[in-house]
Amino acid sequence: MKDLKRKIHYWCSDTMRNKITGKGVVCAVLDTGITQHPDLVGRIVGWKDCVQGKKTIYDDNGHGTHVAGILAGNGKSGRGLYSGMAPEAQIFAVKVLNQRGGGKIRDVINGIRYVLLKQK
């Protein structure tokens, strides 16, 4: 983790010094969905599937889970070697893209609307 952060410190020096952790922040990830990854457990606070309407959280592509990990993974499953930029942030996951990573503008708009309504 130290080597990785040292190499990218020029654009994330605050995260390198652990000043920004994401604590108290809820981030929306509008993508292919999200899985219950060990590095995200307990911090997925919302779910909406705008593509198929499923109630159970899932990611049939993997991209959304990857993005969520870059954003807020805590690194526990990798023994701390890799963590996201805001490892204490909570995630509101919205599936707006299909299994192939494509989607409809309508689903993206509905996902954005849903997040905006939930924040109020």
Where are these regions (language model features)?
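Compositionally biased, intrinsically disordered low-complexity regions enriched in proline and serine
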Residues: 10-11, 59, 115
